């Protein structure tokens, strides 16, 4: 049985390296898969655990003045592709950059999980009136994504990691600028779609910065190159 599994692993290794190693090295593949798995686990498990708990609403007066603009749901949805692309771009640079990002991602998601349990949050979504494609997509997101686990915003957290994870890399300056611009656009989209409120945004950005800083110390101690 052990030999059988070993042969399967070797076959996968050869198959992956012959097809995808130029896009993403094998040593970066599993850690990035781990980011996806941990994100899903933290988000959905905490929702189940806290389903019957009291949820806090951190709505501020400024939040009530922000209008709903359904078209911004396009940025909100495109953020998923942005995450995948930038995580690959960052991870393929070298082991140090890869593991700095991965450690920051893992650490921040664990912190999110703890906060989601200690301080479960929610908000009151507006009624979406209209039948345009943007309103349809906004209604769909509202249907699929319950208004819980809001603080800190994982959307803002991961988008900001996608931008700051490029620090110190040889990635072209224009792409770094684009990544910051898109990350900011994602943060704005969370406000204009009422998926999050302002404290969620700043919480996500702050956690991203702290997590990457800790990730930098981690890779220095482990002496990754």
Where are the language model's segments positioned?
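Membrane-interface loops
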Residues: 46-61, 91-174, 222-224
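Aromatic-anchored segments of alpha-helical transmembrane domains
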Residues: 40-41, 109-115, 181-192
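N-terminal transmembrane-helix/juxtamembrane module of multi-pass inner/ER membrane proteins
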Residues: 2-83, 138
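Membrane-embedded alpha-helical segments of multi-pass membrane proteins
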Residues: 37, 75-82, 154-158, 202-206
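Hydrophobic, membrane-inserted alpha-helices
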Residues: 82-86, 157-164, 181-189
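Interfacial helix-loop-helix junctions of multi-pass membrane proteins
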Residues: 147-151, 185-212
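Hydrophobic transmembrane alpha-helices
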Residues: 163-167, 208-216
